[in-house]
Amino acid sequence: MMTLASDFGSPYPAAMRGVICARTDARIVDVTHEFPRQDVRAAAFWLREVLPYFPPATHCVVVDPGVGTDRAAVVVEAGDHCLVAPDNGVVVPVARRLADATGDHEDDETEGFDVWEYEYADSEMASSTFHGRDLFAPAAAAVHDADAPGDLERCVRTDEWVDLRFPDPEIEEGRAVGEILVVDDFGNAVTNVPGEVVGGLDPVRVDGEEVPVRAAYAELDAGDRLVTVGSHGNVELAVNRSRGDRAFGVTVGDRVVLDW
C-alpha cells in the first residue's frame, strides 16, 4: 500500500499517481491534498494523527516550500512504515509516533526510526517547481518495491535531518498556557494542551472569560462556545455548528490561557 498527501489541491496529484502507477502496482490511497498551502507544521500535525491508523505502507508526503532549492529528500523508516518526503521535518512527528506504537522508541527521542537521504541530481528533474512528480513519486515507487530503503543505491544513511517538534504547554496549579497548533475545517481551534488538563472541570476561563467544558458539541445550543477534547486528545476551542476560531478570535500560533 502507498499513501499520498500534499498541499497541491488538484490536478497535480494525478501526475504523481501516473508516475507511480507506471513504476509499481501499489494500491494508492490519497490521504489529502488539501493541507494548508506550504504549512509544514499543520501537515506534520495531521500526518501524526492519521497515518498510524494505516497498515504497513509507504507514505509519500509533499508539502515543500523549499522545492527547487538544495533541500534534501529523505526516506524515514519507522516501524513497518516508510515515509518519503522533503527534509523539512514534515514527517518527523509521525515517525516518532509510529516508533512509539511499535515499542522501538527509546530514551533518546530520535531513536526508533532511521533516516536516509535520497540522492538525486537537478539534471534529472524535468521541473524545478514540481518535485512531487519528478522526485518524490519515483522515489516512493522505488522504496515501495524495495525490501528496505538501505537496499537502494540512492539511499544514503544520515544522522543529519531537519527536526520538527510541537511546543509544550506551560501547566501549573489552576492554569495552563498553550498555543493554537492548527484550525480544522470546522473552525475548531486545536491547542497543545492535553485533554486531561480539563478533565472534571466545568467551566474554565479562556483568556479570562468563562466557557463551559463539554464532551460533545451538541450538548450546547447552536452558536454556543465550548471547550472540549478532540479526537486527537488535545483541548479544542469550539462552537456548536459554527467556527471556534472566529468566536474566540484566535488563529494558528496564538497564545491561549486556560485557568480555573
Language-model-detected regions and their locations in the chain:
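Conserved active-site and cofactor/substrate-binding residues in soluble primary-metabolism enzymes
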Residues: 11, 15, 38, 42-45, ...
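Active-site histidine-anchored catalytic micro-motif
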Residues: 25, 41-42, 55-56, 60-117, ...
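N-terminal glycine-/serine-/threonine-rich phosphate-binding loop
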Residues: 1-73
